[in-house]
């Protein structure tokens, strides 16, 4: 994939701004049609949530907002996010942002759990990350979908993190996860989500790191036998809308979108992700045998990762940030 440079993004954003509607300028009763993109297939929690979200938004706005869902058909996350600035899609959902402010959140052990992540992101740290996202991509953050745990999967069985040293492991192009794998002695290999299956199948990598639920939906267990049951980071999907599309909505429509996301995220995203863990791991066992789901010492993961997490937090957000995060 050819990367889009910042000049292209800014130019596209400026052009889009000239054509955008001012807030509330839409004629009463007119339907705003939007395109949504996510790299996973329709069976993932992320995409099932978005079907429910936008159906509910349509009801609450009397069909004033209608969103067409494109799940796993428009490319990887980087292409989708950049596509928002270019106008090819209007709403993006995914892990990737290419911003340090969000990307360091993906290092294993950075958050204790999804509830802790929400407390941090709802405060000043999350507000700063959102501002960076808006400036870079001309996009407004609608909310964070807590997807549940990320996991580490390997073709070869491991019993501790020492054994991933030297392994080529697929990682998203996300700093927190790339740095984490380096920190543990592995060789991170950035590969788009929609290319993971083939990379495992043809031997490009020895395993991968990704969110558990989309990995099961993508049947990655067919090409990577073992998976750690331990959380290896938190899945935090950004739901963002282009500022161009956001301006097409009236003030009341904007409030409906934000309120509906907040209401549904707790049950249809966060709790759904927690509920799916047992089912997803059982699917892995059924495909590869009872010993294919491996559990290691979780506190060992946290201890190993703390020096890196402290460095990243204090480097990106300023001295003392890691202590603040731990106190929340």
Each predicted region: which residue ranges?
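N-terminal secretory/targeting leader peptides
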Residues: 2-4, 8-20, 24-116, 134-328
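A gly/proline- and charged-residue-enriched helix-loop-helix capping module
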Residues: 117-127
């Amino acid at each position: 994939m050819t990367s889009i440079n910042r000049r292209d993004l800014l130019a596209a954003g400026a052009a889009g701004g000239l054509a955008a509607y001012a807030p509330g300028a839409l004629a009463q009763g007119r339907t705003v049609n939007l395109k949504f993109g996510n790299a996973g297939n329709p069976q993932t929690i992320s995409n099932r949530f978005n079907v429910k979200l936008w159906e509910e938004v349509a009801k609450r706005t009397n069909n004033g907002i209608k969103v067409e869902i494109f799940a796993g058909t428009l490319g990887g996350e980087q292409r989708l996010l950049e596509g928002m600035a270019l106008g090819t899609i209007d709403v993006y959902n995914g892990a990737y942002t290419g911003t340090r402010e969000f990307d360091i959140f993906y290092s294993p052990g950075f958050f204790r759990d999804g509830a802790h992540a929400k407390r941090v992101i709802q405060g000043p740290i999350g507000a700063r990350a959102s501002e960076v996202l808006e400036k870079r991509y001309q996009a407004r953050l609608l909310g964070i979908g807590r997807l549940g745990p990320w996991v580490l999967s390997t073709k070869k069985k491991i019993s501790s993190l020492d054994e991933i040293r030297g392994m080529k492991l697929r990682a998203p192009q996300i700093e927190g996860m790339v740095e984490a794998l380096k920190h543990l002695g592995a060789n991170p290999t950035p590969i788009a989500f929609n290319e993971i299956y083939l990379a495992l199948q043809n031997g490009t990598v020895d395993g991968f790191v990704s969110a558990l639920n989309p990995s099961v939906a993508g049947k990655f267990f067919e090409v990577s036998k073992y998976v750690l049951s331990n959380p290896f980071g938190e899945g935090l999907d950004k739901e963002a809308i282009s500022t161009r599309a956001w301006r097409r909505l009236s003030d009341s429509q904007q409030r409906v979108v934000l309120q509906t996301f907040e209401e549904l995220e707790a049950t249809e995203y966060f709790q759904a992700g927690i509920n799916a863990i047992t089912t997803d791991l059982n699917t892995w066992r059924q495909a590869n045998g009872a010993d294919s789901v491996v559990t290691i010492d979780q506190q060992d993961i946290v201890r190993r990762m703390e020096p890196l997490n402290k460095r990243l937090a204090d480097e990106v957000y300023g001295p003392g940030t890691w202590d603040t995060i731990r106190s929340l």
